[in-house]
Amino acid sequence: LDAAFEGLTRAKENAEANLQNARELFERSVKRIFSDLVSTHSTTKLSDVTSKITKGSSPKWQGISYVDSPGVLFVTSENVGKNQLLLEKTKYVEEAFNQKDKKSVLAKGDVLTNIVGASIGRTAVYDINDVANINQAVCLMRCLPDRLLPNFLSYLLNSPYFKARLHDGESNMARANLSLTFFREFEVPLPNVREQQKTVDQIDLLASAADECEAQYTTKLTDIADLRQSLLQKAFAGELT
């Protein structure tokens, strides 16, 4: 039994190491992609390639109540994941909110970034058609379609390259909040739209491969935990000799 547990412990450590390596390899690859783009292309202020950079507000400030669906989908920082929306838990507000705060009514393709709290800098594209608005912890960036692709910007803002810029080279520094001015002045590497799409496709492939590896090693860790539990149960039941 001791030998079996030792083997399971080694297998668990190897799976955890491989899982971490898969994540780090993806991050390093994305960082290299954007670093190469910066070295080979000029940069442009984000305000020059977007039609809007703004943030939302609190319904309470506007005298607006939360409601059950249907209503206006109210996107908060909890709903903005890394390159994906997280809509398992959603909130809705009265339709009047969109009349009172028109500037932050969402359109499909808007890029959303968290600007307050632990998830600061986390970015996703609003890729659904629901009528929606955002709160004060989320920044909205609307790209000029002939200059900047939303998915390119989302990958850029989630990349280690951006994190280094965000923290002035100190990747472990905490930052309390980001201002709209920060984003308006932020310099983005700007290849043409065709090259941007190639970059998005390249990162999509890397992300798919990383997700597949993570799924395999996560499943392996679950199997190891289940096997350990099964051995313990058999040992307590006296079924092992």
Feature-to-residue mapping (PLM):
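Interdomain signal-transducing alpha-helices
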Residues: 153, 157, 196-199
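Glutamine-centric residue-chemistry signal
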Residues: 136, 163, 175, 196-197, ...
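Short, ligand-facing micro-motifs at secondary-structure edges
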Residues: 59-60, 81-92, 111-135, 151-155, ...
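Sequence-specific dsDNA recognition surfaces
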Residues: 47-64, 78-108
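Non-catalytic DNA-recognition/assembly elements of restriction-modification systems
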Residues: 3-6, 10, 14-58, 185-197, ...
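Short hydrophobic-aromatic micro-motifs
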Residues: 73-76, 112-114
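A short glycine-rich beta-alpha junction/loop motif
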Residues: 65, 115-116, 131-139, 148-151, ...
